[in-house]
Amino acid sequence: MRIGRAAVAATAALLIGAVGCTNQIAGTATPDPTQPPLALSDDGYGIVAGYPDAPVQIELYTEPQCNHCEELQSAYGGDIERSINLGELAVTYRPLTFLDTPSTDEHSARVANALFLAVGAPEATDEANMSSGLEFQRFVEDLWAHQEPGGPGPSDQQMAKMAEDSGLPADVAGRVGDGEAAGNVNIGEMAAYNYGALIGIDPISTGTPTVYDLGTKQKVDLHDKDWLATLLSS
């Protein structure tokens, strides 16, 4: 347990609709222990924002064009951000791209790529360019606030500005703005893996956003507006 952990009540009143500083050691950068870390999940297809020993660990399945996913970030993003910062919560983001069509200019895939660019590869990243989980959560909130369902979505340059505004390192913003392909994941394989995992959680009501409690191995009821407060107080 970390000093100063306290329960954070969810302040959002919106009920979500249908679920549909680092030290250099031997040339390798290590995350700043005073900041919530950011890392790839063990399977390589998720992005973990938060301390690995946070008492509440969840997965969040989300699609960049899903309006209900935007509603979740709008309603709960601030509380998620604070809880990550306090060490109470760690979120494994699992992006999906099933809403991409020929008319969307790979909207969802490009946003997912930007998310994985934010993580980078620690062995290839100097200490000035390590992202934190807190910065990443802010980036997620900004991206989903600027979604364009059914359209091409934000440009690479617009996403780079969001990354910069979220506090992510300049190196990350530059890579996003250049439209660089993330070297730590294959977006197509990631989307297929995460969709399969989502079906495994709920093969009947399969949709986004879906929150999965890694502690209880249960899907969280997002129709309960107090779902986050309940998790943090359990």
For each feature predicted by the language model, list its residue ranges.
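Alpha-helix initiation and N-capping motif
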Residues: G77, F136, D156, P169-A170, ...
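Extracytoplasmic thiol/disulfide redox context detector
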Residues: R2-S103, G188-A192, G196-G200, L228-S234
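C-terminal cap of thioredoxin/glutaredoxin-like
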Residues: Q24-I25, A160-S234
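Active-site-proximal beta-strand/loop segments in catalytic clefts of secreted hydrolases
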Residues: Y61-E63, R94-T97, D142-W144, D213-G215, ...
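Charged/polar, low-hydrophobicity segments characteristic of intrinsically disordered regions
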Residues: E148-D165
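Structural alpha/beta surface segment adjacent to cysteine/selenocysteine redox centers
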Residues: E70-P152
